[in-house]
């Protein structure tokens, strides 16, 4: 079992027979005073500082930024992890100072979706809870507001059991104190993970990467569909809505000549109308495809006319739908473009 740094700090203080308030001083230094190194924690005794540095290293964060790219409203940070693996995190800036963060959960990804650059890397390993949350801690320590978080970076979050430890850390009022409703988890349809999320974090926003209403085509585009078929995932999502009463998001990447036909739109309408009393809580986000030269099969985004036709069919049939605005595609910071392998 991997204990988080916060649990390890508590144990270290207990082992040194120091009073409990020393832990509270560390947490205050990190989350209230934005102190990024243990050496600068002026309220701590020297003996404790040395022990913290020996255990964790000089920095509070285990993620080390090695490169940054900026384009308009998007910043992409390449982080190095303690074992040398690298992941990417995206910071999106909106009007009135709102900041959103797209974070990674795995080094690489083993699911091989045909249109996704990350999937070409294969699965290297799961990120630890500290590595997941330290992506955000880095930004917090540098004065950013963590207004909303999405697990839409590298990897499939629900395939990493450490995700749930990370969510507990993010939700802990003494640490990050993030409301569940400010967190979104995107999944390709890992049913055991969906069920666990339903019961442990019912207020977290859930987004399902759909991309085709047809089982055979979805299996071709997303091999995970052979293990977790669309119809079985939809049943799990119905149960999630039944249990939580929360809106559920369906992501649909628009691929020119692949999944953007009238037949696809009509099949999607039928799929959602079959949800019965839960149909009104499904919302479809149509996403222009972000081109990448990393995938063996090449795709292009549907044009605006085709996307409007698709959206109009859904809307005319009472389906909640919107076309999502994308940021950062010119620096490979948009959905499906993250690689984390090279200096950016």
From Swiss-Prot:
<feature type="active site" description="Proton acceptor">
    <location>
        <position position="88"/>
    </location>
</feature>
<dbReference type="GO" id="GO:0046872">
    <property type="term" value="F:metal ion binding"/>
</dbReference>
<feature type="active site" description="S-methylcysteine intermediate">
    <location>
        <position position="335"/>
    </location>
</feature>
<keyword id="KW-0408">Iron</keyword>
<feature type="binding site">
    <location>
        <begin position="155"/>
        <end position="156"/>
    </location>
    <ligand>
        <name>S-adenosyl-L-methionine</name>
    </ligand>
</feature>
<keyword id="KW-1015">Disulfide bond</keyword>
<keyword id="KW-0411">Iron-sulfur</keyword>
<dbReference type="InterPro" id="IPR013785">
    <property type="entry name" value="Aldolase_TIM"/>
</dbReference>
<dbReference type="InterPro" id="IPR022881">
    <property type="entry name" value="rRNA_lsu_MeTfrase_Cfr"/>
</dbReference>
<dbReference type="InterPro" id="IPR040072">
    <property type="entry name" value="Methyltransferase_A"/>
</dbReference>
<dbReference type="GO" id="GO:0005737">
    <property type="term" value="C:cytoplasm"/>
</dbReference>
<feature type="domain" description="Radical SAM core">
    <location>
        <begin position="95"/>
        <end position="324"/>
    </location>
</feature>
<dbReference type="GO" id="GO:0051539">
    <property type="term" value="F:4 iron, 4 sulfur cluster binding"/>
</dbReference>
<feature type="disulfide bond" description="(transient)">
    <location>
        <begin position="102"/>
        <end position="335"/>
    </location>
</feature>
<comment type="similarity">
    <text>Belongs to the radical SAM superfamily. RlmN family. Cfr subfamily.</text>
</comment>
<keyword id="KW-0949">S-adenosyl-L-methionine</keyword>
<keyword id="KW-0046">Antibiotic resistance</keyword>
<dbReference type="GO" id="GO:0070475">
    <property type="term" value="P:rRNA base methylation"/>
</dbReference>
<feature type="binding site">
    <location>
        <begin position="209"/>
        <end position="211"/>
    </location>
    <ligand>
        <name>S-adenosyl-L-methionine</name>
    </ligand>
</feature>
<feature type="binding site">
    <location>
        <position position="109"/>
    </location>
    <ligand>
        <name>[4Fe-4S] cluster</name>
    </ligand>
</feature>
<keyword id="KW-0808">Transferase</keyword>
<feature type="binding site">
    <location>
        <position position="113"/>
    </location>
    <ligand>
        <name>[4Fe-4S] cluster</name>
    </ligand>
</feature>
<keyword id="KW-0004">4Fe-4S</keyword>
<dbReference type="GO" id="GO:0030488">
    <property type="term" value="P:tRNA methylation"/>
</dbReference>
<dbReference type="GO" id="GO:0019843">
    <property type="term" value="F:rRNA binding"/>
</dbReference>
<dbReference type="Pfam" id="PF04055">
    <property type="entry name" value="Radical_SAM"/>
</dbReference>
<keyword id="KW-0698">rRNA processing</keyword>
<dbReference type="InterPro" id="IPR007197">
    <property type="entry name" value="rSAM"/>
</dbReference>
<protein>
    <recommendedName>
        <fullName>Ribosomal RNA large subunit methyltransferase Cfr</fullName>
        <ecNumber>2.1.1.224</ecNumber>
    </recommendedName>
</protein>
<comment type="function">
    <text>Specifically methylates position 8 of adenine 2503 in 23S rRNA. Confers resistance to some classes of antibiotics.</text>
</comment>
<feature type="binding site">
    <location>
        <position position="290"/>
    </location>
    <ligand>
        <name>S-adenosyl-L-methionine</name>
    </ligand>
</feature>
<keyword id="KW-0479">Metal-binding</keyword>
<feature type="binding site">
    <location>
        <position position="186"/>
    </location>
    <ligand>
        <name>S-adenosyl-L-methionine</name>
    </ligand>
</feature>
<keyword id="KW-0489">Methyltransferase</keyword>
<dbReference type="InterPro" id="IPR004383">
    <property type="entry name" value="rRNA_lsu_MTrfase_RlmN/Cfr"/>
</dbReference>
<feature type="binding site">
    <location>
        <position position="116"/>
    </location>
    <ligand>
        <name>[4Fe-4S] cluster</name>
    </ligand>
</feature>
<keyword id="KW-0963">Cytoplasm</keyword>
<dbReference type="GO" id="GO:0046677">
    <property type="term" value="P:response to antibiotic"/>
</dbReference>
<dbReference type="GO" id="GO:0016433">
    <property type="term" value="F:rRNA (adenine) methyltransferase activity"/>
</dbReference>
């Amino acid at each position: 079992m991997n204990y988080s740094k916060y649990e390890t700090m508590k144990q270290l203080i207990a082992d040194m027979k120091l009073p409990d308030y020393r832990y509270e001083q560390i947490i205050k230094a990190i989350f209230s005073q934005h102190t990024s190194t243990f050496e600068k924690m002026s309220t701590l005794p020297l003996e404790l500082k040395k022990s913290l540095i020996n255990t964790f290293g000089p920095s509070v964060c285990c993620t080390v930024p090695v490169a940054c790219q900026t384009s308009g409203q998007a910043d992409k940070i390449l982080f190095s992890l303690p074992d040398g693996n690298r992941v990417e995190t995206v910071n999106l800036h909106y009007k009135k100072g709102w900041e959103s963060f797209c974070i990674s959960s795995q080094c690489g990804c083993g699911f091989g979706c045909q249109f996704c650059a990350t999937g070409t890397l294969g699965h290297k390993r799961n990120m630890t809870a500290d590595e997941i949350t330290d992506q955000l801690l880095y930004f917090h320590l540098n004065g950013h507001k963590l207004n909303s978080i999405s697990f839409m970076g590298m990897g499939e979050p629900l395939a990493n059991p450490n995700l749930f430890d990370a969510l507990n850390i993010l939700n802990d009022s003494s640490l990050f104190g993030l409301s569940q409703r400010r967190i979104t988890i995107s999944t390709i349809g890992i049913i055991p993970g969906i069920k666990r999320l339903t019961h442990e974090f019912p207020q977290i926003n859930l987004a399902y990467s759909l991309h085709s209403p047809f089982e055979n085509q979805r299996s071709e585009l997303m091999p995970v569909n052979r293990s977790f078929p669309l119809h079985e995932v939809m049943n799990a999502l119905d149960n999630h809505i039944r249990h939580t009463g929360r809106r559920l998001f369906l992501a649909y990447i628009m691929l020119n000549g692949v999944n953007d036909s009238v037949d696809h739109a009509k099949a999607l309408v039928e799929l959602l109308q079959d949800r019965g009393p839960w149909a009104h809580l499904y919302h479809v986000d149509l996403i222009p495809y972000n081109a990448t030269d990393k995938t063996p099969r090449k795709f292009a985004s549907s044009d605006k006319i085709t996307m409007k036709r698709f959206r109009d069919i859904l809307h005319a049939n009472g389906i909640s739908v919107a076309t999502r605005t994308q940021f950062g595609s010119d620096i490979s910071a948009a959905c499906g473009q993250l690689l984390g392998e090279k200096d950016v």
